């Protein structure tokens, strides 16, 4: 699972997921999976989608993961009263804004890439679309 090796602080504020994304262009591969909606992806969801894509292309070509879960999410244990401090870090998430390229792929035909991204998109909680690299 993806998570930072070390962070400056163990826990962070909840914050808000506003604004537009950085990294909106396909830059490494030829095809990409771009987020249309806004939300957050857990490390498990990112890994599940990656596995689905890898199996679909039968380990051909190359896949790039363009998102990294760098925000810790805390939870308090079951049946614990409110207060007494912030809970423990349970999992890590990546905040996603519309337009962010989540995955990229190269070295496979377009039809196979579309099918692989369709399988990956089913594992994700946000709406996505298929994009190709624009050559100027």
Curated annotation (Swiss-Prot):
Keywords: Ribonucleoprotein, Ribosomal protein, RNA-binding, rRNA-binding, tRNA-binding
Name of protein: Large ribosomal subunit protein uL16
Gene encoding the protein: rplP
Oligomeric form and interacting partners: Part of the 50S ribosomal subunit.
Coiled-coil portions: none
HAMAP family (alphabetical): Ribosomal_uL16
GO biological process: translation
Origin superkingdom: Bacteria
Source organism phylogeny: Bacteria, Pseudomonadati, Pseudomonadota, Gammaproteobacteria, Enterobacterales
